[in-house]
């Protein structure tokens, strides 16, 4: 059970917290609010920080969907997206769902796995609003879902073939941009660094039939010390690709 502060007079919040096994704690560091049909997370000792929400409909993710470079993006190349090939992807470290959304918007079917229940609650709320949206709702319902389990091992019990497992473990950020500082400060204090990130690679390789893609900061070592088959570099990050079989 995860402690959280919330207004116990709001049935919606009570239901969300019960669903994700979040227990009321008057002294909790974090608060969940439900305002304007949106679930948001707030750090109570930093009231000036905006709440964190998952929003697939407006803002930065919507802009990236429209103007982000389509299949020419490095992430699309990394997962093997090409003409006639629409891989099924498991995002094993979903976070706020941004990379998963990019892949879904390009045609992949994406299953998100998020082990922290507060983050999972935010993701589910973001999906709920996206599913209702007139512009993106139809394909979002078809291509993007949240798995109600906390591990890749749990997902492997489902009898469905997964082409690609995508991992973006939490790594200490050097980036000093305001957004990264704000979101990462809140996020890392909530979920902590992925100290067991190296343990994600083996189950990912067991689950994926075609490849595993690991997003890393450019200064980070290889996950679990395993050298990838190929690397796709961007300005600040890289995608390490572990190939098991050809995409077709």
Curated annotation (Swiss-Prot):
It is an enzyme of class 2 (transferase). Its EC number is 2.1.1.242. InterPro entries: 16SrRNA_methylTrfase_J (IPR007536), SAM-dependent_MTases_sf (IPR029063). GO terms for cellular component: cytoplasm. It is found in: Cytoplasm. It comes from the Bacteria. Pfam families: SAM_MT (PF04445). Its main location: cytoplasm. S-adenosyl-L-methionine binds at residues 98-99, 114-115, 150-151, 168. Keywords: Cytoplasm, Methyltransferase, rRNA processing, S-adenosyl-L-methionine, Transferase. The keyword S-adenosyl-L-methionine applies. It catalyses: guanosine(1516) in 16S rRNA + S-adenosyl-L-methionine = N(2)-methylguanosine(1516) in 16S rRNA + S-adenosyl-L-homocysteine + H(+). GO terms for molecular function: rRNA (guanine-N2-)-methyltransferase activity. Specifically methylates the guanosine in position 1516 of 16S rRNA. Belongs to the methyltransferase superfamily. RsmJ family. HAMAP family: 16SrRNA_methyltr_J. This is Ribosomal RNA small subunit methyltransferase J. It comes from Shewanella baltica (strain OS185). The lineage of its organism: Bacteria, Pseudomonadati, Pseudomonadota, Gammaproteobacteria, Alteromonadales.
């Amino acid at each position: 059970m995860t402690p959280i502060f919330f207004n116990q007079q709001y049935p919606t919040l009570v239901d969300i917290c019960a669903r994700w096994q979040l227990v009321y704690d008057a002294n909790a560091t974090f608060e969940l609010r439900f305002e304007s049909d949106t679930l948001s997370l707030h750090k109570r000792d930093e009231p000036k920080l905006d709440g964190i929400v998952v929003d697939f409909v407006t803002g930065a993710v919507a802009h990236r969907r429209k103007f982000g470079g389509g299949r020419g993006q490095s992430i699309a190349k990394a997962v093997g997206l090409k003409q006639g090939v629409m891989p099924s992807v498991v995002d094993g470290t979903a976070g706020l769902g941004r990379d998963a959304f990019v892949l879904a918007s390009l045609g992949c079917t994406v299953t998100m796995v998020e082990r922290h229940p507060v983050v999972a609650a935010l993701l589910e709320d973001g999906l709920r609003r996206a599913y209702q949206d007139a512009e993106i709702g139809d394909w979002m319902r078809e291509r993007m879902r949240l798995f109600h389990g906390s591990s890749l091992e749990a997902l492997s019990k489902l009898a469905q073939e997964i082409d690609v497992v995508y991992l973006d473990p939490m790594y200490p950020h050097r980036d000093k941009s305001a957004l990264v500082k704000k979101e990462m400060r809140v996020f890392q204090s909530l979920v902590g660094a992925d100290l067991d990130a190296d343990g994600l690679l083996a189950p990912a390789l067991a689950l994926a039939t075609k490849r595993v893609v690991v997003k890393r900061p450019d200064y980070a070592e290889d996950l679990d010390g395993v050298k990838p088959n190929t690397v796709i570099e961007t300005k600040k990050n890289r995608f390490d690709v572990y190939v098991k079989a050809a995409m077709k």
